[in-house]
Amino acid sequence: MSKVVVCALYKFVELPHFESLREPLQKTLEDNGIRGTLLLASEGINGTVAGSREGIDAMLAWLDQQPGLDKIVSKESYDEDMPFYRTKVKLKKEIVTMGVEGIDPKRVVGTYVKPSEWNALISDPDVVLVDTRNDYEVQIGTFKNAVNPKTDTFREFPAYVKENMDPAKHKKVAMFCTGGIRCEKSTAYMLEQGFEEVYHLEGGILKYLEEVPKEETLWEGECFVFDNRVSVNHDLQKGEYDQCHACRMPITEEEKQSEHYIQGVSCVHCVDKFTDEQRQRFIERERQVQLARSRGEEHIGAEVLSAVEKHRLEKALEKERQRKVREAKAN
């Protein structure tokens, strides 16, 4: 079995003094050799980290001793290598960003469905199955017959519901996401909008892949994950996808053979989305990454874009999305 344990966790709970948890949690992670990112907000905790079996157990034991953070349910998968470069504990307004005020999964939330009961639910012809993840995640794997809202970010999901779903028409709705957290808010939002029967997969796709045998699965493809593995297969081992470090899209080995693919600079998904100035920054970043690797060092540029580059990328992608919307309306 792979030696690195990758642990995804979250819990919605009132943490009025969440700021005071950042430093001791950061120290706990560092002392136990754990890397990855955890988010803290007044509404709870969320994130994915990785480390040894002993390190992850020590972190979970520490969390269990903190008021409100006991009994956190986590999902585990495995990797041969450490999938993160750094250790970060961040303070946020939300632990998963939907951008709708007043949505509180602690107060209102959909009906949880265990992985063992999920197949029966989504096989019901009266159930509308909705994938709440982003379009680039859905492209590499989803459940059979699932609806893809084709959102670029979770913030776009409420608009999708308003424009495409109707409580009077869609009587039963089942939803799923990677680990379950997005469905906590999406189901709460839909109930607030008047939908009566709203279900979601308890523990998300990761828990389903862990518990449901391959011969019974209704999952098709691989599951996108937000770390260096890019995707995991049904065995929760590293999948077949790589990632373009310019636009962060998952790419296949076949797509890497394209003339548009330049490692760290561009791929078939983003070849027309960046300026020459941005490409030059990507080229320099990739040069630094390769130089660090040749020295046996790590370079954080391989993990994330700088804050400025990320902001510019988001603006470029938003412009592209708006262009597609205009074209669709014109047609």
Swiss-Prot record:
GO terms for molecular function: oxidoreductase activity, acting on paired donors, with incorporation or reduction of molecular oxygen. This is tRNA uridine(34) hydroxylase. Its EC number is 1.14.-.-. It is an enzyme of class 1 (oxidoreductase). Keywords: Oxidoreductase, tRNA processing. Residues 123-217 form the Rhodanese domain. GO terms for biological process: tRNA modification. Catalyzes oxygen-dependent 5-hydroxyuridine (ho5U) modification at position 34 in tRNAs. It comes from the Bacteria. PROSITE patterns: RHODANESE_3. It catalyses: uridine(34) in tRNA + AH2 + O2 = 5-hydroxyuridine(34) in tRNA + A + H2O. InterPro entries: Rhodanese-like_dom, Rhodanese-like_dom_sf, TrhO, TRHO_N. The active site is at 177 (cysteine persulfide intermediate). PANTHER family: RHODANESE-LIKE DOMAIN-CONTAINING PROTEIN 7-RELATED (PTHR43268:SF3), THIOSULFATE SULFURTRANSFERASE/RHODANESE-LIKE DOMAIN-CONTAINING PROTEIN 2 (PTHR43268). Coiled coil: none annotated. Belongs to the TrhO family. Gene3D superfamilies: 3.30.70.100, Rhodanese-like domain.
